[in-house]
Structure formats: structure tokens, C-alpha cells
């Protein structure tokens, strides 16, 4: 009889333990306001929150990561056709939905590749889990994410400028090939891949990058504004740009990056109302000094750049991760924080433009 009681108690204990573990992820409270609650007069707070441990575990509603192949060109002296590929995050429910999806074009840093954010197809990172949870909890809009590479043939290249020239040149590949081919294959806000429709859907497109991917992001602000409203550079500045440009203006001269951006925005036919820059870096990141220099320079050009501190009112801000360095941990933190904020901005703008929510 005693043995039966002991066995019963052990089984009961195991069942209780399993139930507690199963519910642990469900009990994680939301960190951000659900995007569906955003109204035309909602304030959008700016700040960095820590990633709850539960968000790093697999979500119930899991998106997937697949490979997307496309044809492009070197767009240099070689003038060579290339077959390249990107990894694509497809949110849970995409296949059964008829909705259109925002797109985040995402770029790795120096020596990185398309796996730098999501991982390998058979060994995905917990960044993917974080995105799944944010979408499941309605803290960010379901978005397609395109993890691309600026390297020719998707192969790391030896360069004498830490890839700066490649980050600048990627604009032609993006505009002419990757963007139209991807948005032809997937259901985005572009009604077609005509130039007119791609431009008309710019409010639902984001460019995001880490390190030299952040440099890529700043360059896209200078040449691709017709396709993108939102720019999210993680830990990188134009002071890391191509060597000829930096030599011309000076690596430690803080007074040229904002004017360069200002001139490029105007040359593309846009104004201060046409974009938002959500920059993030860490206080212990080696990129911090030059990122902060660029942000300070932009603050001096208030006709074009209107700085936000606590909430979204202007068109750019810098959020700092306390003690964050230049690493994967910081990347995950910035993904976790930036995508909900951008989602809220997109929803609020859609409401204001539609005239709904009166």
C-alpha cells in the first residue's frame, strides 16, 4: 500500500511540474502595447526594455524561415550576372491569410551573411523565437523579413574598407532586383512591382541593419527613400562609410554626416515628413562614439531632423542599451524593441491617413 501511495505522489508531482513548465511561457506578460490598440491620438513611447526569458523559447504560433533565390548583377566593372539568395522570415498564418504584409529588409555586418539574424535553416536562433512571440502577443505587426547580403554571390569578400563600398553599392541590387523580385513572389502592400506601386507602398517598408548593415541602412536613406519610410540602424554610422567619402570629410570631423543626409534627402525629392530613423546602440559598444557623433550632428540640422527623446513626435531618435556591446545579445535586444515601436508608428500613420478612428 505504501508503495502505491509513493508512486501516486510521484506521478502527481511530475504532472504538476509539467503543467507549471507548460504555462511558464504563457504567463510572460506583454512588454509593449498591442499594435491593435493604437489610435490616432496614441502616444508612442521610446525606450529599451529587456527581453523576457520566455520570449527566447519557442512560441506556440511559430513562423518559418525559408530561402529565396533571385537574379542580380554585380553593378561594378565586372558587370556580371549573379544568382543570389536571401533568407525570409514568414510569420505564422501568412499562408492562410489574404492580408498584405509589411516588409523589413535586414542586413548583416562585416563578415556576416544571411544567417546572422535568423540562423541556419536547420538551426534557427532565438531571435526568431523573439519575433514569433512579439507577433503572437500582438506587440508587433506580422511582418515579412528579408535577410539579405551585400556580398557578391553570398560569399564573404576581402575588402580594404571593411565592406563600406559594398554597403553603398547594394542600393542598385536592392532597387533593381531583390525588392521587385521578392515583392512579386510575396503578398506585400505593393499592388504590383511597377515603379509606381512600389513607391506608393513605401509606408509599409523598413530597412534595418547591424554594424556595417547599419551603414547600409544610412546609405539606403540616401538613395532609396522612394521605397522606404522607416530606417533602423543598429550600431553603425556614416563615419564608417566608403573610404573616399570619409577621407574627403574626415573620420573625426563631426560636422558632415547630417549635411550629407540632408542633401541626399532633398535630392530625392523628400522632406522631413517623409521618414523616421530609429537608431540603437550600446553604451559599451565600440560604435557608440561615432553613432553619437552622427546623431548630435543631425540635431544641429533641425530643419530636416527633429529629435525625439521620450516619445514619437519628430522623425529620428537614438536609443541606448545600457552596457550593451557589439554582439548578438545586443542585436536580439534591439530587434525586440524596435519592431514593436515601428509597428505602432505604421498603424498610427495608417489611421491618420485613412481618417478612421475619429
Where in the sequence are the language-model features?
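Short, conserved catalytic or interaction motifs in soluble domains
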Residues: 20
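C-terminal motif of bacterial Sec signal peptides marking the signal peptidase cleavage site
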Residues: 14-17
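Positively charged n-region of N-terminal signal peptides that target proteins for export
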Residues: 1-4
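Short, linear, compositionally biased motifs with a strong N-terminal bias
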Residues: 10-11
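Non-catalytic cap/lid and distal C-terminal segments of serine-dependent acyl enzymes
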Residues: 23-358
